[in-house]
């Protein structure tokens, strides 16, 4: 689950849940947009590199077509 705030042409994550814990997003860089599907099912994603209140750097993305969010990874 990701909570967002609207921007001009996209939404920005401000908080996300990983399991039972909520994490505040202090800064979010993006979106980096990726799309395709000429020979397969079409897809469109928006990736954000985020810094949390705990100082973690995480990678979130939104499936634009479905509106669902995913924790893609993190850096340590």
Task: Locate the predicted segments by residue.
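Non-catalytic peripheral regions of nucleotide-handling enzymes
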Residues: 1-76
């Amino acid at each position: 689950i990701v909570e967002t705030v609207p921007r001009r042409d996209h939404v920005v994550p401000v908080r996300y849940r990983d399991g039972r814990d909520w994490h505040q997003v202090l800064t979010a860089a993006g979106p980096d947009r990726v799309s395709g599907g000429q020979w397969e099912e079409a897809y469109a994603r928006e990736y954000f590199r985020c810094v949390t209140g705990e100082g973690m750097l995480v990678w979130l993305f939104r499936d634009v077509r479905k509106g669902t969010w995913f924790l893609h990874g993190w850096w340590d």
